[in-house]
């Protein structure tokens, strides 16, 4: 368990609202859908009003994807202005969040197929502008060791505060979690466990340790059943 972290690492909301949070990662790691899942988690579990902001001006339809996720799930998103650069989008988002009474702003940054200097300098610039309370690395648990070395590279550039492991609903998640935590020394905060908007769960080191050791995860199963059926039916 100590390899995975001793305690649950909750989201840091101890900042003057709107609290900025940044999501970084490689392309294909599920960053944009994870942004929407995290927004829904903060709204449902922390009772926060969230604004989502896409800073990905490179991937075709990336901004539209986040806007669409916002519309489908009733989450506030910053209106898109074609051609606006990430630094300018950040400034506009900070003002708009204040005007809209948002408690938290989630910034979905651009990914790349691999780490490059341009990507890292852009993320560093964004970090300097928004001064995030949390910077989450979104990493695909199926990429294992690669994801772990990526985590280390991001940590060397920005103040990485947590990892969100996506596609963590398979057998490989335990090994990926151990290597990510061990190599990067960054706490894992959430697991993406499916496609639905509410398929994001807080990472519990003890439960994952039980899964790795083959002891099953009764607590998670009961919680999942309670969520699906409603607390009363379980009792």
Give the location of each predicted region.
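Structural motif
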Residues: 53-55, 78-81, 107-110, 138-140, ...
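Aromatic-enriched hydrophobic runs in primary sequence
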Residues: 4-5, 23-24, 41, 69, ...
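Conserved phosphate-handling catalytic cores of large alpha/beta enzymes
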Residues: 90-91, 102, 114, 120-127, ...
């Amino acid at each position: 368990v100590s390899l995975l972290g001793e305690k649950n690492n909750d989201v840091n909301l101890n900042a003057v609202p709107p609290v900025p949070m940044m999501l970084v990662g490689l392309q294909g790691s599920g960053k944009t859908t994870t942004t929407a899942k995290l927004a829904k988690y903060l709204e449902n579990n922390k009772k926060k009003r969230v604004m989502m902001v896409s800073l990905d001006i490179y991937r075709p339809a990336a901004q539209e994807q986040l806007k669409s996720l916002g519309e489908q799930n009733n989450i506030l998103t910053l209106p898109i202005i074609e051609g606006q650069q990430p630094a300018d989008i950040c400034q506009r988002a900070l003002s708009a969040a204040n005007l809209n009474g948002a408690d938290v702003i989630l910034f979905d940054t651009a990914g790349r197929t691999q780490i490059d200097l341009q990507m890292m300098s852009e993320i560093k610039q964004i970090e300097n502008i928004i001064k995030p309370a949390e910077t989450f690395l979104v990493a695909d648990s199926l990429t294992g060791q690669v994801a772990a070395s990526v985590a280390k590279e991001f940590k060397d550039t920005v103040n990485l505060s947590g990892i969100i492991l996506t596609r963590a609903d398979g057998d490989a998640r335990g090994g990926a979690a151990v290597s990510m935590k061990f190599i990067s020394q960054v706490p894992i905060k959430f697991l993406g466990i499916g496609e639905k908007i509410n398929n994001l769960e807080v990472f519990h080191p003890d439960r994952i340790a039980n899964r790795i050791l083959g002891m099953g995860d009764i607590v998670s199963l009961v919680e999942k059943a309670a969520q699906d059926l409603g607390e009363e039916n379980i009792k």
